[in-house]
């Protein structure tokens, strides 16, 4: 049976930027951000070495939100380059201001749909890690097809990972956690990682405001990690 990538749909959110955010965006975005909102299949693959100005391990974070985890994990591993993808401009602006404040040099950003980025901008076997933290669970059954992590998406991610590369996910939605586990374990190129598995990147992440709120509501966070087979 053919695998199909999920239908792309996003919830509406306020996206107005503050005056300070607009100023920072105008000054820094041309240097460390690109827009993939206007999607075209003829887009060129990213040259990450040219974009970052060095050749090193690269991690892609899907749906970075306001960038709390992105910033902390990039600061923890300054020798690893991070590409943060987010469809909401306001979240990227918040991250951009934090990058400017803390003078972090190993983060780049893409404004657009992560599925498009993975399909057309990221080359096969080019990433050391893909992070998907708290993707929208789309809890209604009729909306499950919109969930980002589907068998076809996991297959695409596995193709973009280098051998030994890492898929790191987290969710506070129990049904989605079961689905993610099933899809990840069902991907032939991936094997489940545990505390004894040697990984090329850190999987230590900060607790975000969203996660704290979820825990206070009694939700259990499930963290799932896979390593691409050599």
UniProtKB/Swiss-Prot annotation:
List all disulphide bridges recorded for this chain.
Answer: none
Tell me which species this is from.
Mycobacterium leprae (strain TN)
Q: What is this protein called?
A: tRNA (guanine-N(7)-)-methyltransferase
Q: What is the lineage of its organism?
A: Bacteria, Bacillati, Actinomycetota, Actinomycetes, Mycobacteriales
One of the record's GO molecular function terms: tRNA (guanine(46)-N7)-methyltransferase activity
Keyword S-adenosyl-L-methionine tagged = yes
Q: Which residues are involved in binding substrate? A: 140, 172, 208-211
| Recorded name of the encoding gene | trmB
Pathway assigned to this chain's UniProt record = tRNA modification; N(7)-methylguanine-tRNA biosynthesis
Q: What family does the Swiss-Prot or TrEMBL record give for this protein?
A: Belongs to the class I-like SAM-binding methyltransferase superfamily. TrmB family.
Chemical reaction(s) catalysed: guanosine(46) in tRNA + S-adenosyl-L-methionine = N(7)-methylguanosine(46) in tRNA + S-adenosyl-L-homocysteine
Recorded GO CC terms: tRNA methyltransferase complex
